[in-house]
UniProtKB/Swiss-Prot annotation:
It is a peripheral membrane protein. Belongs to the ATPase epsilon chain family. This is ATP synthase epsilon chain. GO terms for molecular function: ATP binding; proton-transporting ATP synthase activity, rotational mechanism. It comes from the Bacteria. Keywords: ATP synthesis, Cell inner membrane, Cell membrane, CF(1), Hydrogen ion transport, Ion transport, Membrane, Transport. It comes from Yersinia pestis. Its main location: membrane. SUPFAM superfamilies: Epsilon subunit of F1F0-ATP synthase C-terminal domain (SSF46604), Epsilon subunit of F1F0-ATP synthase N-terminal domain (SSF51344).
């Protein structure tokens, strides 16, 4: 018997990043981690910066960095509308490490709530990119 699946589209402002049949996905929603399996209840939620883990129809995994966006779950299709989406293979590790270093320095030198909040957001994005790079390397 074939595994239960559904259709997934991951779209950014620039292009369609993924379109295909999947077994499940994992993504960080506004209220926490979400695992979307076939037959999931309809849902519309914001996505926090982080990654989407895609388990394709035959079990292969793909990781994509998302800077945020919207997740829509319908009975037979799931759509991710991302602000920015970058495949793990396309991320630059040296650049992500430099962004992380700069954000950490900014946090240590921040002089107000706004500075700290912005630096914290930049740090979270850099860490998410590094995690996507790490998981993409492991999956290869």
């Amino acid at each position: 018997m074939a595994a239960m699946t559904y259709h997934l589209d991951v779209v950014s402002a620039e292009k369609k990043m993924f379109s295909g049949v999947v077994q499940k996905i994992q993504v960080t929603g506004s209220e926490g981690e979400l695992g979307i399996f076939p037959g999931h209840a309809p849902l519309l939620t914001a996505i926090k910066p982080g990654m989407i883990r895609i388990v394709k129809q035959f079990g292969e995994e793909e990781f994509i960095y998302l800077s945020g966006g919207i997740l829509e779950v319908q009975p037979s299709v799931v759509i991710v509308l991302a602000d920015t989406a970058i495949r793990g293979l396309d991320l630059d590790e040296a650049r992500a490490l430099e962004s992380k270093r700069k954000a950490e320095a900014h946090i240590n030198n921040s002089h107000g709530d706004v500075d700290y909040a912005q630096a914290s957001a930049e740090l979270a994005k850099a860490i998410a990119k590094l995690r996507v790079i790490e998981l993409t390397k492991k999956a290869m």
